[in-house]
């Protein structure tokens, strides 16, 4: 008898933070006098394809993870086209691959890239991660699929730093992500700030 496949859905809000002319955004306090504006950013991560609504064999997880939010940056900064709207596809994963707490499976790389930033603006770029109603210090996106959802399974985002440092998605300023080293300024601009990550399934308990 074939079992009903479990569902996996999580919501992730992403926003960078900065201060503009005394105005405070998202509780952050960064130095600088230039005004900032929002750029919309949306990513979609699917476990298997078929429009993200799939009927998988027994012992497999299915569903989708929606990444959405905004990047707040100075007027000189722009978001690379391929970072604005994207689908990050996670492969089908068998239950045996997530059999115990702390186990991860199916890591998929993705990045968020800015362009045309001057040196000062690039150094101020920060990303603040928040996933739905995640609690303080939580380092995975909770499953919001509803009835029939996979239990104890979420989505983890880690840095592409060679170590796989988990990103905390509680939306606190202390856990915001600073732009990596952007290189030397060239003709008023810098090498594109690029935030690199991996998204994967996580058995959290």
UniProtKB/Swiss-Prot annotation:
S-diacylglycerol cysteine lipid sites: 20
User: According to its UniProt record, which protein family does this protein belong to?
Assistant: Belongs to the fimbrial protein family.
Q: What is its main location?
A: membrane
Q: Which InterPro entries match?
A: Adhesion_dom_fimbrial (IPR000259), Adhesion_dom_fimbrial_sf (IPR036937), Adhesion_dom_sf (IPR008966), Bact_Fimbrial_Adh_Pro (IPR050263)
Task: Note the topology in the membrane.
Answer: Lipid-anchor
Query: What compartments host this protein?
Result: Cell membrane; Fimbrium
Q: Which residues form the signal peptide?
A: 1-19
Q: Which Pfam families match?
A: Fimbrial (PF00419)
* Residues carrying lipid (N-palmitoyl cysteine): 20
Sorted UniProt keywords: Cell membrane, Fimbrium, Lipoprotein, Membrane, Palmitate, Signal
Q: Which organism is it from?
A: Haemophilus influenzae
Tell me the GO BP annotations in alphabetical order: cell adhesion involved in single-species biofilm formation
Q: Which gene encodes it?
A: hifD
> Can you name a GO cellular component term?
plasma membrane
Name of this protein: Minor fimbrial subunit HifD
Q: Which SUPFAM superfamilies does the record match to this protein?
A: Bacterial adhesins
């Amino acid at each position: 008898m074939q079992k009903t496949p479990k569902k996996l859905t999580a919501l992730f809000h992403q926003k960078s933070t900065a201060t503009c002319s005394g105005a405070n955004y998202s509780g952050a306090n960064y130095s600088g006098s230039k005004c900032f504006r929002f750029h919309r950013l949306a990513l979609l991560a699917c476990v298997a394809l078929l429009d993200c609504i799939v009927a998988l064999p027994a012992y497999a997880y299915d569903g989708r993870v929606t990444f959405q939010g905004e990047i707040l940056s100075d007027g000189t900064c722009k978001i690379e086209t391929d970072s604005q709207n994207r689908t990050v596809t996670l492969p089908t994963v068998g239950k045996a691959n997530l059999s115990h707490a702390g186990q991860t499976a199916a890591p998929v790389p993705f990045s968020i890239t800015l362009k045309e930033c001057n040196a000062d603006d690039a150094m101020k770029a920060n990303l603040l991660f928040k996933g739905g109603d995640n609690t303080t210090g939580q380092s995975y996106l909770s499953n919001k699929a509803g009835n029939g959802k996979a239990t104890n399974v979420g989505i983890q985002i880690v840095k592409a730093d060679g170590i796989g440092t988990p990103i905390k998605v509680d939306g606190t300023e202390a856990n915001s992500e600073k732009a990596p080293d952007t290189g030397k300024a060239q003709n008023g601009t810098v090498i594109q700030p690029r935030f690199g990550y991996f998204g994967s399934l996580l058995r959290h308990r």
